[in-house]
Amino acid sequence: MFACAKLARTPALIRAGSRVAYRPISASVLSRPETRTGEGSTVFNGAQNGVCQLIRREFQTSVISRDIDTAAKFIGAGAATVGVAGSGAGIGTVFGSLIIGYARNPSLKQQLFSYAILGFALSEAMGLFCLMVAFLILFAM
């Protein structure tokens, strides 16, 4: 956020020699001339508005900004993929409980098995949902 705007300048800004280019990018983007009142003449604000638009455009489409967006996509997709491991653990827990329940009371075999299938389906659905969100983050944004 405190990256100096002079590192991300266009050739037009270099020729203009504007003092705005030496301010931090956050200050250049957030201090819009149209939001300030009573500060200088309208001619100066109009000229500075053009320079601020150039800086804002360069700030929004810079290589660093795209790299940050790509890194955020990969981090988000990785975090969403962790849910698939939770699904595997849930399936293991469900069938482990089925075996323990069957060992304790073999007469409830059919009812325990139907509950185990229901638990398996819910765990698998959550895992697939997490995987779908990861793919959406990667390829739809």
Swiss-Prot record:
One of its GO terms (biological process) is proton motive force-driven ATP synthesis. Residues 1-66 form a transit peptide. The record marks 124 as: Reversibly protonated during proton transport. It is found in: Mitochondrion membrane. Its main location: mitochondrion. There are three genes which encode the mitochondrial ATP synthase proteolipid and they specify precursors with different import sequences but identical mature proteins. This is ATP synthase F(0) complex subunit C3, mitochondrial.
